[in-house]
Amino acid sequence: MRNEATMRNWSMGEYLLRRYRERQPLLPLGAENVDELRQWQAQFRAKVWEGLGILPEQKCPLEPLTVDRTDMGDHWREKVLFQSEPDMTVPAYLLLPKDLRQGERRAAILACHGHGNGKDDVCGITHGEFHRVHAIRAHNYPYALRLVREGYIVLAPDWRGFGERRLGGAYGGKDYCDVLLIKCLLFGLNPLGLNVWDGMRCLDYLQTRPEVDGERLGCVGLSYGGTMTLFLAALDERVKAAVVSCYLNTFGGFALQLGNFCGVQVPIGILRYGDLGEVAALIAPRPLCVEAGRRDDGFPIDETRKAVEVVRHAYRGANATERFVYDEFEGGHQWHGEISIAFLHQWLPPNKDDRTD
């Protein structure tokens, strides 16, 4: 009797991990050439969209407004607002290099923040608070500043649930990301999908700016910023180059095993069809750089390597292996930047005439 009892399982954690290990995805990536890859991408992309919940049926006017312009020494920082939906405003910082000439149009990059204080972190804004200074330094977080100093125009928005858009009133100290997901699910909405929508509206906004070459847009981000970069680049082909830092992994690794995710990172039902490697494969043949720290406790490096092999397969099928760069560095959960900045300069230089590929 006792031996029979010990063979039973009542752990939900083990139950879900077993389901993950035994699952047979309905849309595995097996494409070996360009035509097969395109066909697979169309099928898998449709399933990713399904997992993002109900989205607006059409785009509303942006109604852009610049509410502040600050001299930051080597660049201008504008505080801008625009509508992603009729009743939803996106607050963002637009960083403009001071050497931008009259009539010049440059490449622009969407700098996606991770968990923390939203757009302030990637722009290096600490408000004099020690914990912000420490967190920004530890994660090498202000990549929006690095990019504007490299000559790019940079847009850094607050995603829904973060920064000025943080959800208040989570009862009993519950995780606000999880509460946001639960509230959204009551309406058939998904905060990841809504943020992807807002990311698309960010690209729309950049394309209205006279300083921006609307055909040369990029996207970068660390952690949840990597989530946003991955999904936005996978779903919107206006993203011509992407840098995903400390996010690409497997759901079996960082999510089901470690529980290192939250309610704004959930493409519902995705494991029926594939995993994050397959989502990243949707970006091929556009240039993609993936950063991963060997000492990142939240994203096991062995699981990242599994996902990277899926991505490599896609770029081989696209005859574009030179457009995928994997930077595995000695470090933890942080923006690396040593290879990715050179990658951006190669595939999406600030000035069109500087492209070297």
Segments predicted by a language model, with ranges:
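Cap/lid segment of the alpha/beta-hydrolase catalytic domain
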Residues: E104, L110-W197, Q207-T208, G253-Q257
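Short beta-strand/loop motif that positions the catalytic acidic residue
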Residues: I283, V290-A292
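Mobile cap/lid helix-loop segments that gate and shape the active-site cleft of serine hydrolases
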Residues: V179-L186, L194, R201, V239-A281, ...
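Alpha/beta-hydrolase fold nucleophile elbow
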Residues: E211-S223
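Glycine-rich nucleophile elbow surrounding the catalytic serine of serine-hydrolase chemistry
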Residues: G221-F231
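Glycine-rich active-site/cofactor-binding loop and its immediate structural neighborhood
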Residues: R69-F130
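N-terminal targeting or regulatory segments adjacent to alpha/beta-hydrolase or S9 domains
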Residues: M1-W76, S84, D353-D357
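C-terminal catalytic histidine-bearing segment of alpha/beta-hydrolase fold enzymes
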Residues: E309-D357
